[in-house]
Amino acid sequence: ALISKPETPAELKRLWYAFRDVEDGCTYTAEKLHDLKKIDALDVWRKARLAMDNNRPRAARLALNIESTELGKQAILIQADPQKYLDKRLLAITKKRKELAVLALIRVANTDPDKAAQLVDKKWGLMLTKEEHNWVWAVIGKQAAQKLQDNAHSYFNKVSRNQDLNDDLLIWKTCAALRQGDWKAVVASIDAMDGGKQDTT
């Protein structure tokens, strides 16, 4: 009865995204919402992206298990050696292969954002959708910003649509723009954030 309320699926999805560690109750609820078509494949993939970005491989695996256990197994391989995972895959044609490549690129970016940027520029960027492309560049920019790299802002500038990003990535995009004095980018990033997260003071 709870998840039949119109506002509940969105709120539960938000909570599911927010949990960095695995919560059995949240995972179970997400599975049921998926069965009821209240969350879709992109929602599941975004949860896996967030988990991989936060170095929570088990959470990524459990999220992908909602789609299929085989996808969950791929998360384990990506976590173990993302570069090897990408090297073994020449093409990413299907939606699932593209998203798995996104997870691997996120994992590479965690340790070496410049290396991840090279991989996107030389090969993988051509195979990804616009949304995937924007998310990956934002993660690369975030990791570079956390390392106080001067090129973080240039990575974020490769994002063509701020609305494809979540608030966490937009916050880091704002920080990188502030460091470079790019006020136009600062305003654009803040405007793209969820209304409840903006600080207007």
For the regions a protein language model found, what residue spans apply to each?
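Inward-facing hydrophobic residues that define packing positions of alpha-helical scaffold repeats
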Residues: 9-16, 63-64, 120-121, 153-157, ...
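Residue-level signature for tetratricopeptide repeat
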Residues: 1-3, 50, 107, 143, ...
